């Protein structure tokens, strides 16, 4: 996989939190979030997202959130890596692997890291239903620690389609 080639001196900013969403129709949860956060004008299709950032000279870390437990549609890690490869002047790919995937998730992480396709692991404890100190996540931490790659994770509540933040998963939010 082609590594990023970002000329940071040419950038005006760098966004470290850019979701690449699935390319199908919005789910009810997504519609409610767009309305709540007033983000309806933000580009959702990937070519437009790339152009949005490039035209403003903003670099970005792109990722998805693997939600295998919720069933919510999401982009795949390979799609995120491909996006970053196609837009290597502005994008750096992080993968997202649910720690509950176990050995299969660890093997996927090793493959993505070895290929050079990703430069970090984005976890989301409230959505993926684990505590940051849960041993279920240790094997993934080890893959990325060995590669000297970061593992950022938010610890805030999760937006739900009910028009509020979820209370059921706030226990994972620190």
Go through the PLM ranges and name each one:
Residues 24-30, 162-172:
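Histidine/acidic-residue-rich catalytic or RNA/ligand-binding cores of hydrolases
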Residues 59, 67-167:
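Active-site gating/metal-coordination segments in enzymes
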């Amino acid at each position: 996989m082609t590594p990023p080639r970002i000329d940071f001196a040419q950038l005006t900013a760098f966004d470290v939190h850019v979701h690449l969403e699935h390319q199908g129709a919005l789910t009810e949860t997504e519609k409610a979030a767009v309305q709540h956060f007033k983000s309806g004008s933000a580009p959702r299709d990937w070519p437009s997202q790339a152009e949005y950032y490039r035209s403003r000279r903003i670099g970005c870390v792109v990722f998805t959130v693997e939600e295998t437990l919720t069933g919510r549609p999401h982009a795949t890690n390979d799609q995120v890596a491909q996006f970053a490869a196609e837009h290597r002047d502005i994008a750096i790919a992080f993968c997202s692997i649910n720690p509950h995937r176990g050995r299969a998730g660890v093997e996927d992480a090793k493959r993505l890291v070895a290929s050079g396709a990703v430069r970090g692991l984005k976890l989301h404890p409230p959505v993926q239903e684990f505590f940051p100190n849960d041993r279920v996540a240790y094997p993934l931490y080890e893959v990325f620690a060995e590669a000297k790659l970061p593992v950022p994770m938010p610890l805030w509540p999760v937006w739900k389609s009910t028009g509020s933040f979820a209370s059921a998963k706030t226990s994972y939010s620190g």
